[in-house]
Amino acid sequence: MATWLGKKDENTNTIANKLIVPVGSDWIDNTKILGFYNPLKKTYESTKILDFILLACDNPEIPFFLILGEMNLSHVERYFSDFLSAMESHEKIILYSKDEDCDSDIPESIDLPENLFVTGTVNIDETTYMFSPKVLDRANIIEFIPAQSDVLANFEAETQSIEIEPVNDGSAEGFLALAKTVRETTTLPAGSDICKTILEGISNILDGSGFEFAFRTAKEIRLYINAAYALAQNDEKTLSEEDYVNLMDEQLLQKVLPKVHGNRSQVGTLLSNLSKYSEEQNLKESKKKIDRMLKQLETSQFTSFI
């Protein structure tokens, strides 16, 4: 999508508003993201990511996509803490003190630009770290599980990659305008009462479990629903009750279940209740995932989302 909504730099023939950065296992603080003030040289040592953010600040009319590869090779809370705080407080990120004698074009502080969209890929093995609730509350976790038929087809003949070119038809600007509209919408769309009903049901099941969702989670679910509504209106369509149920299915899967983990005594009853409720409300994808987690709990006495 970042390429499709990309803007080509005519000088370098690259997508100027897309940056892919692999996260290293040595990212122990924010310097790999935001750089640092060098007191010996009296200048600011920038990074590709900071330069990209500043470019986004200078071009607020188009979206910018920052993609972090294998972002859990290091503790996200350590290197991404300033971003997490700015997302919550909307305050400036301080880069260096105004009292420093800094010979640099880098400003003392930056706002987190509204046209910056951050995505990260995740691998789970013995070399990676799990996400804290603070991170999970601010993200949608999308699990990619290839169909076995696709895996076998790739064994027989390697799947060819799809070449994608920027569309340059105003879609990037339209995407950003839609995102801003969704962020500014503070109420749910008409006809979405079923969403509140399902959310209340999930909340009642989670109550007292230690995995209750916070104010931010509820807000982000509302934004997700409003985004789907806005997209439907863009295409001159309306959302049915079934559509709203599917949206809540996706949000249970992407925002609630990723936080659930533990042994049988901690989450056994909780997952069983969520499985039953998902079946009652026709939350099909969540039901499948919960049952896989229950199966893992049965075989290894412990389960987690990923």
Name each region found by the language model:
Residues M1-D169:
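AAA+ P-loop NTPase catalytic core and its hallmark functional loops
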Residues E114, E158-I306:
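Alpha-helical lid/collar subdomain of P-loop NTPases
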